[in-house]
Amino acid sequence: MVKYKILVATGDSVFAGSANLVHLWLVGEHGEADLGKQLRPLLGRKTELEVDVPLHLGRLLAVKLRKQKGLLDSDWFCKSITVQGPGTQGEAFFPCYSWVQGKETICLTEGTALKVTDDTQNLFRKYREQELENRRNVYRWGSWKEGLILPIAGSTERDLPRNQRFMKDKDLDFSLSLVKELKNFAIKGTLDFVSRVQKLEDYQKVFPHTKTALPERVRGSWKEDALFGYQFLNGANPMLLRRSMRLPARLVLPPGMEDVQTQLEKELKAGSLFEVDFSLLDGVKPNIIIFKQQYVTAPLVMLKLQPDGRLLPMVIQLQPPRHGCPPPLLFLPSDPPMAWLLAKIWVRSSDFQLHQLQSHLLRGHLMAEVISVATMRSLPSLHPIYKLLAPHFRYTMEINTLARNNLVSEWGIFDLVVSTGSGGHVDILQRATSCLTYRSFCPPDDLADRGLVGVKSSLYAQDALRLWEIISRYVERMVELFYRSDTDVKEDPELQVWCREVTEVGLLGAQDRGFPLSLESRAELCRFVAMCIFTCTGQHASTHLGQLDWYAWIPNGPCTMRKPPPISKDVTERDIVDSLPCLQQARMQITVTKFLGRRQPVMVALGQHKEEYFSGPRPRDVLKQFQEELAIMDKEIEVRNASLDLPYEYLRPSLVENSVTI
């Protein structure tokens, strides 16, 4: 008889334990031992077993487990199983982090990461193949709207694989906070039907009380040109600003504006001319809300970077020129204050549309979902890249399914209160999909292409580059443990299938936009994996965390505009408030922004996941080094922000979530 000591860890979330007995088997290279119904898993507990096995199993390869159905059937969340005894080299660790359901038999392989080519005796081949076959049946590609990158199949969150659903603590927090915000909306919103905005200060009625000082600062300074320009550098959407290489062709300067032309050319020559072009919105059909037409424009903003780092607007053009029509009106800082303010408000509303749809939803949420589904379909749990990426997929599929069903669905939030709802938002997403280049997801390339490297007042650029470098070093160190040469990368068939699954299937053939169809070297692999992790963490955080800060004061980021853009510069405050959202629309914007933009109480910061997918000290040391570098960056940002008038925190590692969860 051979003695084994087994330690089974159950999750500590509500309902993670089970009333059912669990059947266990030990699988070794010389045979398999049935341990019988040995275990009743308890919430948050580690259950210890000592068993005698009548045969020598040799090297321990796997643990199989199956939950026995009783009178009361309940799922069980198994974290991991640890085995001590012969063939374990002291101790063998079997990561699980999965729900055990029904009578399904789950096979947990030992946590040492292995590529196909490492398994020279084919000991794990059948486990890899069976796991991927099962996963491809469970994780199927779906289709939401034609021309958009692919989601997970499933109409509602109940259709998702159990392992991708919210744990009970997350589910309760999400549901209760949503009920709270909707209750407040219902109570206070009834008064909005009898109230009308008479002046800009009336939006104070819906201005929320927040835990940070920035919304109040925005409310007090939103009219200032410096704050208007600052938002393109470090606001909720820092993804549109780029340095001008030439004057845009659409910028038609009519006679009498020679001085403006001279100023623009001077800044262009000095390398201090920047632009934000919203042409993606041109021709988008605007929404009709409660039988009232809403309006959308496609502005162009030209800005100059001052020696002190301030970015100031020089010219605003609200619409592109049309053939056979007079040149569109240009707005200048020297115009009457109300005309200039209304032009800036139109820009802020346009920025709201592209921020929420292109930068946040598409580039953050939907891109992370493509990566997660492709990984689940292509890489078995033994694979080192699966183990590296798995912590960054937590809750992404469910939050995206909820967004498709409630935010951008028919009669969802966009249809109810946003100027691009009722189809325009889908048009924008389809157009933006064609702009998804590989370089734009890698900050060193993206920031270089947009001319933002070295711009000291772009705190987003500085922090994005720093975070990318830390993530890249983490990936490189981990890859070096398992890929000794470029040949190892090229000859890894599962890795190549995964890369093609992302680019050709999930991204609908994005190889023409620079995404790789294959990975030919360690450098290419590291860049691709770093892109995946940054997308699921920093990329999303940079466009998510600022929502409440910058949109709490409605005139600074209106979700819709109720009047067409001005055709003259004879503008009054009445014209402005009649253009901005009514109080009902404004309150709904605040309700959604508060709910989605709040700091999450159930949150795992970047690199702080507790799941251990790797076994052995070397991967653990690499993760520890990653955490140490993140802590240094976090502290340095804290020190920097203490001396800043406007602190920038959206890429602070302690605030960046480890995955897209909200």
Swiss-Prot record:
The lineage of its organism: Eukaryota, Metazoa, Chordata, Craniata, Vertebrata. Keywords: Cytoplasm, Dioxygenase, Fatty acid metabolism, Iron, Lipid metabolism, Metal-binding, Oxidoreductase. It is found in: Cytoplasm. Coiled coil: none annotated. Catalyzes the regio and stereo-specific incorporation of a single molecule of dioxygen into free and esterified polyunsaturated fatty acids generating lipid hydroperoxides that can be further reduced to the corresponding hydroxy species. Shows increasing catalytic activity within the series arachidonic acid < 5,8,11-eicosatrienoic acid < linoleic acid < 8,11,14-eicosatrienoic acid. One of its GO terms (biological process) is lipid oxidation. Fe cation binds at residues 360, 365, 540, 662. One of its GO terms (molecular function) is arachidonate 12(S)-lipoxygenase activity. Its main location: cytoplasm. Expressed in epidermis. SUPFAM superfamilies: Lipase/lipooxygenase domain (PLAT/LH2 domain), Lipoxigenase. It catalyses: (5Z,8Z,11Z,14Z)-eicosatetraenoate + O2 = (12S)-hydroperoxy-(5Z,8Z,10E,14Z)-eicosatetraenoate; 1-O-methyl-(9Z,12Z)-octadecadienoate + O2 = 1-O-methyl-(13S)-hydroperoxy-(9Z,11E)-octadecadienoate; (8Z,11Z,14Z)-eicosatrienoate + O2 = (12S)-hydroperoxy-(8Z,10E,14Z)-eicosatrienoate; (5Z,8Z,11Z)-eicosatrienoate + O2 = (12S)-hydroperoxy-(5Z,8Z,10E)-eicosatrienoate. This is Polyunsaturated fatty acid (12S)/(13S)-lipoxygenase, epidermal-type. Arachidonate 12-lipoxygenase activity is decreased when the pH decreases from 7.4 to 6.0. Gene3D superfamilies: 3.10.450.60, Lipoxygenase-1, Domain 5 (1.20.245.10), PLAT/LH2 domain (2.60.60.20). The keyword Cytoplasm applies. It is an enzyme of class 1 (oxidoreductase). Pathway: Lipid metabolism; hydroperoxy eicosatetraenoic acid biosynthesis.
